[in-house]
Curated annotation (Swiss-Prot):
SMART domains hit by this protein: EF1G
Oligomeric and partner information: EF-1 is composed of four subunits: alpha, beta, delta, and gamma.
Hydrolase as UniProt keyword: no
Protein species of origin: Arabidopsis thaliana
Protein name: Probable elongation factor 1-gamma 2
Length: 413
C-alpha cells in the first residue's frame, strides 16, 4: 500500500511532509476528492483521527495524525538522507528548532492571522500580545541566521522544512514587507529556501502579502421595517449630479526616474550591444560601453555581499543570487547588473556591478528589494583608472577575477 495524504490542497501541515518526501525520495499519493467539512467528518476518516483534523497520513502500518509527526515519519522512511542530522547533537538541535518554530513562530502567527480571517473572535489587546511574541521569536531566529545558512549543519534538515512552511503562511497572509524588513536574515533565509526545487515543487511561487487583512466587521442588525403609509405622488426625480458619478481613473504616477533630464545614453542600446557581441568583447562591447556611458544621467555601483562566510554551499549561494535578481525585476527598465560568484570552494564571495539611471541608487529599489541591505554599496569613481578597469573586467566576466576562479557570473539586463 502506498502512503496516502488525506487533506485539502495547500494545507500547511501536509506541505511539511510533502517537501520532506521530495528530499527523502518517498512517494506520497494525495487523496482525491477530499472535501473539508465533509470527508473529515465521515466515519472512515474519524477512524484514522477521532477529532477529524487534517492532515492524516495513511500508511501500511496504520494512520498518523499531527503534521510534525507525519513529517518525522516521512523523513525517516528511507533512512538515506540528512534531514535528521548526522549526529545525536544535530538531531537534538533539529528537534529544538522544530519545537521553537511551532511554539514561538507558528502559534503566535496564527493568533494574529485567525481573527483577521474571521476564524476566531478579534481582540486588539490579544493581537498586540501575539505580534509582540512573534517579533520576539523572529528576533531570536534572525540572530541565529546571521551566522548560519541553515538552522542546523550545512544542509537542509527537517527543522528548515517545518520552519519555512510555518513562515510561508505568515508571509502570504499577515507579515508584510514593512513587518519582515526588521528581520533581514529571516527574509534572506525564507526566500532562499522557498526557491529550492524541492520546496518550489510543493509550495509553488511564494508571494508576500502587501497588506494585513482588515478586521472583519460584524453585520449590523437590520432595523424593523416601518409600517407602510399611503403612497404620495412621487416627486420628479432629479438628474444625477455629475460630481456624484464615478470618478475617472487617475493617471498612474510616473516613476521619478522618468522625470530626469534626457540622457544621451540609451540603456536598451547598451543591452543589445552586450547581448549581440559574440567575439572581441573587450574591443567591441567594453569600448562601446565607455563610449555610451553618461555619468550625468547614470551611475555605476560596486556591491559586496556582507555575509560571505555563510556561502559554504554552491547551489545555495547561486540560488541566493538568483533570488536577488528575480526581485530586481521591478528595476529592469532603469538598470543593468553583473553578479559574480567567486571561488572554487566555500565560502564563496559574491560581488556585483550595477548601472542605475540617475546619480544615486533609486529609492524605490532600496525600499522594495530587501536584498539591497545585505550588500555593501560603493559608488564607482570613473576618474580612478583602477576602478574603471574593475568595471570592465566585471562586465566581461574576466577570469580569474581578483585572483579567484568564477563559480558563475549572472547578468541582469
Amino acid at each position: 500500500m502506498a502512503l496516502v495524504m488525506h487533506t485539502y490542497k495547500g494545507n500547511k501541515g501536509a506541505n511539511k511532509a510533502l517537501i520532506a518526501a521530495e528530499y527523502a525520495g518517498v512517494k506520497i499519493e494525495e487523496s482525491a476528492d477530499f472535501q473539508m467539512g465533509v470527508t473529515n467528518k465521515s466515519p472512515e476518516f474519524l477512524k484514522m483521527n477521532p477529532i477529524g483534523k487534517v492532515p492524516v497520513l495513511e500508511t501500511p502500518e496504520g494512520p498518523i495524525f499531527e503534521s510534525n509527526a507525519i513529517a518525522r515519519y516521512v523523513s525517516r522512511k528511507n533512512g538515506d538522507n540528512s534531514l535528521n542530522g548526522s549526529s545525536l547533537i544535530e538531531y537534538a538541535h533539529i528537534e529544538q528548532w522544530i519545537d521553537f518554530s511551532s511554539l514561538e513562530i507558528d502559534a503566535n502567527m496564527l493568533k494574529w492571522f485567525a481573527p483577521r480571517m474571521g476564524y476566531a473572535p478579534f481582540s486588539a489587546p490579544a493581537e498586540e500580545a501575539a505580534i509582540s511574541a512573534l517579533k520576539r521569536g523572529l528576533e531570536a531566529l534572525n540572530t541565529h541566521l546571521a551566522s548560519n545558512t541553515f538552522l542546523v549543519g550545512h544542509s537542509v534538515t527537517l527543522a528548515d522544512i517545518v520552519t519555512i512552511c510555518n513562515l510561508n503562511l505568515g508571509f502570504a497572509t499577515v507579515m508584510t514587507k514593512k513587518f519582515t524588513s526588521a528581520f533581514p536574515h529571516v527574509e534572506r533565509y525564507f526566500w532562499t529556501m522557498v526557491n529550492q526545487p524541492e520546496f518550489k515543487k510543493v509550495l509553488g511561487d511564494a508571494k508576500q502579502t502587501e497588506a494585513v487583512p482588515p478586521v472583519p466587521t460584524k453585520k449590523a442588525p437590520q432595523p424593523a421595517k416601518p409600517k407602510e403609509e399611503p403612497k404620495k405622488a412621487a416627486p420628479v426625480a432629479e438628474a444625477p449630479k455629475p460630481a456624484e458619478e464615478e470618478e475617472a481613473p487617475k493617471p498612474k504616477a510616473k516613476n521619478p526616474l522618468d522625470l530626469l533630464p534626457p540622457s544621451p545614453m540609451v540603456l536598451d542600446d547598451w543591452k543589445r550591444l552586450y547581448s549581440n557581441t559574440k567575439s572581441n568583447f573587450r574591443e567591441v562591447a567594453i569600448k562601446g560601453f565607455w563610449d555610451m556611458y553618461d555619468p550625468e544621467g547614470y551611475s555605476l555601483w560596486f556591491c559586496d555581499y556582507k555575509y560571505n562566510d555563510e556561502n559554504m554551499v554552491s547551489f545555495v549561494t547561486l540560488n541566493k543570487v538568483g533570488g536577488f535578481l528575480q526581485r530586481m525585476d521591478l528595476a529592469r527598465k532603469y538598470s543593468f547588473g553583473k553578479m559574480l560568484i567567486c571561488g572554487s570552494e566555500g565560502p564563496f564571495k559574491v560581488k556585483g556591478l550595477w548601472l542605475f539611471r540617475g546619480p544615486e541608487i533609486p529609492k524605490f529599489i532600496m525600499d522594495e528589494v530587501y536584498d539591497m541591505e545585505l550588500y555593501e554599496w560603493t559608488k564607482v569613481d570613473i576618474s580612478d583608472e583602477a576602478q574603471k578597469e574593475r568595471v570592465s573586467q566585471m562586465i566581461e566576466d574576466a577570469e580569474p577575477f581578483e585572483g579567484e576562479a568564477l563559480l558563475d557570473a549572472k547578468c541582469f539586463k
